[in-house]
């Protein structure tokens, strides 16, 4: 039983719902049901319960935050919607995500305790219900207050949390106590769990009060050392309750919906019909009974024609989807997400395509970029970061719409091919897996696939939760399995290795004591200057010298808190004193590459935009690479500007220094751009800063070895820029003496090319242009000579009469010449069958003779291929005589 003092002292009684069997607390003696859907209908539509007047979402948000500030909470800024600090999920799905796993595990203290926040969040669990149910959103703000209770520090727990909720709704918002129900439940998410109260008012869940004290391990609940108050008050839900509009979309997006309706020519629906439809939709699950059946049931309950209801509701659903999804996508892009086929980009593209799909099915049309721009104008006051990203958002939305149009053009052929493949496998039509494959591989929405299939005489059922299932496959990050040269158990008892490479990155040699030798080749020292592989930087190499011997260090890896050296040759004995010597030339080159990587990523961001995020990196010799999120290949001018900016930073000889900072302090000072290189799992993080404190050039959390100043890099040269995946661009670059060697090699090749072209290096461009003109003229002449030669050969073909047809077989391994000969010969002789054999292939041309019988005969002698009515080609390894005889039989 979950209880609280405020409930008992305020006249609440515990009851059990006869329908769902849940326990709940209410002041009303006549309340029978739990107050949640589907047990009760909405009772606030057209009849809001609050006395307080709330003007806007901003007003409601401010009331909430001020209420908790008055109650000794610290207001903190909202976090981004992309969870850069986590390695398990892409998007923030609730305010508690901001503090998982570091704060909830006890590894890092919270930024304040207790605290209050209003956190933009994204959940695609119910994406298929958005627009239909009247209440579901993909993007929403979760207002929350959190308290973190430690074994030695109690803040507050169930009693105080419940009292805050009661007082906020009754005193701050003026909702009568009798309207509020507290329903007992259990919550689980993000690896944690706990009992909870769901706060319900007139059938609508407006808040959840979670008392988190479990960690979920292998399906079991394990007590956490912390007891965490995790609350969630739905900003949009509460605002809807206070406004009493037919749907949450009308309350939250009212001004935008009015503009969108006017632009698209969609009439405003009857409020009474939409209100009743919303009430009934809220009490049923279309995924269970089917969407079309749900329309029929609701139409009957309202007393209207089902067809009329669909005609009224569906355009509104499309607008609701547009309003919700466009805000969510704008949040994502403003936070650095590029629509693509992977990761968070996949989810952004999915939402954009759902907008386009719904608008198309509703029969309304306008450039999506225009509809987005209208919404951005509405959002700019609440979310200034979205307005700042307006140019990028509109560019990406326009690109996505053009791609979608191309997808629609290619859909008929792709769906037809998929249907043929399904039939070959013994199935009559397409199943859910086929629809997923068509969407993931070619971007074809299932509704479009169903339309095409229907036009071909096949009915295809689209699952009502199709997009939710797609999203569920992409919301979590894939964790790469970690490999280790040594089992953790073999070094767990050893003390932490002193990491001299952090104390002095320029240390070339050092003395140390051997703590353990494992399997004759893994050496653990008490301290080391050898850098272990990590963060895209390769491990150091070198030697360990000891009395009576020397071992070559070929690899270095971190295993927990210990650094393990992989050696070749006889290892030093345990307890021995050794002298470690780092391959300094290699290490120094890698330091230049690593510091150069930081300079380059910041230069890329400054030229291409703040949406640039590192998607991977590898520092190596003689070249390194960095992969970044970007929607197109940068122009030559942009690459030149990036390179120039990077080398200006090198010339400025900016100071480079690392400092250890508490995680919260670093995040508060620099933001989550710290994690360009990925998540850093530590209470304290090593922050690498380039440039002075008053104007740093770049700041990142980084565990690599670096230079003292950018001047030591010498030169940064971009060697290649390529698009390696949808939404990912790779920069290959080099630094220092390797960059000089690369430039010198380019100079040598330029001089050699100039010599071949017949000019000096300064005249190379003009010389190449002349050569290109000559080559073009020679190519024109060659094509003309080939046509004349083909025509001559066509006239002199030796063909034999086979029945009423003429057959000619020619040995020729030149496809282009064969095509020209065939074109000339078959255009003047419709009864000609012309076959070219060579290079393990056979090609058949005819003037008008059907090749089907010929192909059938050829397959009997080893031909593997096919074609059209008058053309066939494929593999043929046999002899010419056998081929001739097969064709003669076919023509006889």
Curated annotation (Swiss-Prot):
Record-listed E.C. numbers: 6.1.1.7
Record-level Gene Ontology MF annotations: alanine-tRNA ligase activity; aminoacyl-tRNA deacylase activity; ATP binding; tRNA binding; zinc ion binding
UniProt keyword Protein biosynthesis, yes or no: yes
Matching InterPro entries: aa-tRNA-synth_II/BPL/LPL, Ala-tRNA-lgiase_IIc, Ala-tRNA-ligase_IIc_anticod-bd, Ala-tRNA-synth_IIc_core, Ala-tRNA-synth_IIc_N, Ala-tRNA_lgiase_arc, Ala-tRNA_ligase, Thr/Ala-tRNA-synth_IIc_edit
Keywords, alphabetical: Aminoacyl-tRNA synthetase, ATP-binding, Cytoplasm, Ligase, Metal-binding, Nucleotide-binding, Protein biosynthesis, RNA-binding, tRNA-binding, Zinc
SUPFAM superfamilies xrefs: Class II aaRS and biotin synthetases, Putative anticodon-binding domain of alanyl-tRNA synthetase (AlaRS), ThrRS/AlaRS common domain, Translation proteins
Binding site for Zn(2+): 594, 598, 702, 706
Chief place of localization: cytoplasm
HAMAP family in alphabetical order: Ala_tRNA_synth_A
Job of this protein: Catalyzes the attachment of alanine to tRNA(Ala) in a two-step reaction: alanine is first activated by ATP to form Ala-AMP and then transferred to the acceptor end of tRNA(Ala). Also edits incorrectly charged Ser-tRNA(Ala) and Gly-tRNA(Ala) via its editing domain.
Domain-related comment: Consists of three domains; the N-terminal catalytic domain, the editing domain and the C-terminal C-Ala domain. The editing domain removes incorrectly charged amino acids, while the C-Ala domain, along with tRNA(Ala), serves as a bridge to cooperatively bring together the editing and aminoacylation centers thus stimulating deacylation of misacylated tRNAs.
Assigned protein family: Belongs to the class-II aminoacyl-tRNA synthetase family.
Protein name as it appears in the record: Alanine--tRNA ligase
Organism field: Pyrobaculum neutrophilum (strain DSM 2338 / JCM 9278 / NBRC 100436 / V24Sta) (Thermoproteus neutrophilus)
Gene: alaS
């Amino acid at each position: 039983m979950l209880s609280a003092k405020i409930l008992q002292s305020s006249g609440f009684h515990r009851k059990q719902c006869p329908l769902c069997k849940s326990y709940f607390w209410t002041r009303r003696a006549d309340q029978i049901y739990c107050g949640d859907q589907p047990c009760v209908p909405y009772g606030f539509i057209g009849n809001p319960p609050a006395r307080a007047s709330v003007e806007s979402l901003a007003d409601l948000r401010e009331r909430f935050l001020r209420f908790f500030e008055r109650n000794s909470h610290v207001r903190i800024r909202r976090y981004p919607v992309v969870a850069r600090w986590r390695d398990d999920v892409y998007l923030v799905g609730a305010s508690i995500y901001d503090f998982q796993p570091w704060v909830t595990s006890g590894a890092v203290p919270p930024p304040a305790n207790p605290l209050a926040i209003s956190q933009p969040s994204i959940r695609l669990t119910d994406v298929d219900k958005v627009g239909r149910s009247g209440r579901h959103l993909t993007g929403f703000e979760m207002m929350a207050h959190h308290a973190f209770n430690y074994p030695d520090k109690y803040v507050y727990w169930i009693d105080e949390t419940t009292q805050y909720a009661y007082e906020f709704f009754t005193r701050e918002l003026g909702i009568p106590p009798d309207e509020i129900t507290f329903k007992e439940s259990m919550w689980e998410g993000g690896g944690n769990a706990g009992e909870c109260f769901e706060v319900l008012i007139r059938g609508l869940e407006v808040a959840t009060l979670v008392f988190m004290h479990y960690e979920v391990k292998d399906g079991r609940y394990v007590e956490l050392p912390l007891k965490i108050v995790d609350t969630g008050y739905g900003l949009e839900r509460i605002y809807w309750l206070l406004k009493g509009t037919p749907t949450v979309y009308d309350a939250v997006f009212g001004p935008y919906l009015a503009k969108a309706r006017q632009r698209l020519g969609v009439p405003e629906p009857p409020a009474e019909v939409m209100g009743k439809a919303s009430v009934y939709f809220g009490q049923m699950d279309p995924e269970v009974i089917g969407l079309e059946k749900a329309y029929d049931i609701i139409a009957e309950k309202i007393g209207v024609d089902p067809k009329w209801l669909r005609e009224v509701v569906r355009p509104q659903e499309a607008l609701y989807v547009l309003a919700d999804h466009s805000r969510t996508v704008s949040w994502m892009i403003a936070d650095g997400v590029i629509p693509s086929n992977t990761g968070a980009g996949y989810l952004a593209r999915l939402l954009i395509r759902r907008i386009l799909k719904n608008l198309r099915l509703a029969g309304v049309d306008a450039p999506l970029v225009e509809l987005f721009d209208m919404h951005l104008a509405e959002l700019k006051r609440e979310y200034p970061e979205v307005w700042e990203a307006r140019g990028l958002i509109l560019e990406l939305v326009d690109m996505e719409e053009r791609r979608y149009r191309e997808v629609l053009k290619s859909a008929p052929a792709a769906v037809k091919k998929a249907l043929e493949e399904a039939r070959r496998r013994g199935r009559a039509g397409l199943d859910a897996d086929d629809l997923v494959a068509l969407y993931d591989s070619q971007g074809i929405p299932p509704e479009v696939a169903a339309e095409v299939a229907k036009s071909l005489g096949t009915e295809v059922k689209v699952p009502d939760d199709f997009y939710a299932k797609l999203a569920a496959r992409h919301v979590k990050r894939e964790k790469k399995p970690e490999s280790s040269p040594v089992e953790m158990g073999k070094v767990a008892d050893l003390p932490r290795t002193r990491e001299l490479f952090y104390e002095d990155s320029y240390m070339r040699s050092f003395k140390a004591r051997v703590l353990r030798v494992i399997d004759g080749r893994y050496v653990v020292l008490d301290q080391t200057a050898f850098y272990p592989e990590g963060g895209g930087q390769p491990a150091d190499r070198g030697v360990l010298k000891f009395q009576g011997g020397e071992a070559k260090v070929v690899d270095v890896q971190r295993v927990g808190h210990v650094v393990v050296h992989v050696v070749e040759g006889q290892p030093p004995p345990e307890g021995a004193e050794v002298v470690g010597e780092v391959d300094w030339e290699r290490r120094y080159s890698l330091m230049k590459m690593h510091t150069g990587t930081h300079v380059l990523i910041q230069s890329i961001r400054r030229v291409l935009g703040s949406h640039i995020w590192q998607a991977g990196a590898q520092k190596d010799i003689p070249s390194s690479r960095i992969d970044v999120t970007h929607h197109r290949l940068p122009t030559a001018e942009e690459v030149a500007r990036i390179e120039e900016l990077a080398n200006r930073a090198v010339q400025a000889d900016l100071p480079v220094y690392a400092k250890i900072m508490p995680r919260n302090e670093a995040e508060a000072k620099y933001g989550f751009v710290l994690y360009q290189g990925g998540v850093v799992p530590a209470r304290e993080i090593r922050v690498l800063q380039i440039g002075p404190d008053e104007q740093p050039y770049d700041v990142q959390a980084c565990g690599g070895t670096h230079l003292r100043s950018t001047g030591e890099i010498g030169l940064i040269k971009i060697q290649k820029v390529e698009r390696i995946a949808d939404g990912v661009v790779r920069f290959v670059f080099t630094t220092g003496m390797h960059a000089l060697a690369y430039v010198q090699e380019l100079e040598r090749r330029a001089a050699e090319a100039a010599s071949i072209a017949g000019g000096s290096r300064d005249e190379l461009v003009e010389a190449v242009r002349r050569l290109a003109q000559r080559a073009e003229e020679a190519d024109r002449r060659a094509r003309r000579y080939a046509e004349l030669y083909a025509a001559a050969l066509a006239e002199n073909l030796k063909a034999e009469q086979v029945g009423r047809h003429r057959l000619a077989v020619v040995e020729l391994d030149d496809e282009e010449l064969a095509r020209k000969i065939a074109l000339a010969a078959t255009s003047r002789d419709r009864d000609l069958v012309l076959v070219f054999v060579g290079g393990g292939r056979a090609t058949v041309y005819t003037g008008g003779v059907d090749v089907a019988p010929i192909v059938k005969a050829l397959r009997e002698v080893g031909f593997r291929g096919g074609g059209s009515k008058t053309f066939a080609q494929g593999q043929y390894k046999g002899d010419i005589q056998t081929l001739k005889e097969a064709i003669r039989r076919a023509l006889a």
